[in-house]
Amino acid sequence: MIHIHNKNFNLAQIMDSGQCFRMNQVKPEVYDIYASDRYVRIRKDSEGYMLDCDQSAFDRFWKNYFDLETDYASYIQAIDPEDTYLSAAAAYGSGIRILRQDLWEMIITFLISQQNNIVRIRGCIQRLCEHYGALCTDSSGSVYRAFPTPEALAGAGEDALRT
């Protein structure tokens, strides 16, 4: 288990920010996050968040994905106090991180997001993964689907992707 103690990290805010669509709240204060071919369950506790992964997985992927080495507090402190608009935005979304997502996954989700709402986008992404993503297994033996590769989507054909 890895602990994140950072006041500028809030999974609920990140999940609702519209950056990614494979982050789900499965119980109060419990989140399942899928990124590329990776999965992690994260629980909120009184001190921050606990990631259900080992140090190696955290260092190789999740630390970078959540941009945890960037000091967001310093950006917030640098905002001119007289800029009420930016100050209010920073206070409202102080827990949002800029996710460092896989470029392919980000482009495809961006294209799907056009003229759609978050619920519909999540459904489209989930179906893409179910139909065209490679099978993966997490550390507990549970099976999930990776985000499909360009080759997998190209092989599906345009008609199949439209349905």
Question: What is each PLM-predicted segment?
Answer:
Residues M1-T163:
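HhH-family (HhH-GPD) DNA N-glycosylase catalytic core used in base-excision repair
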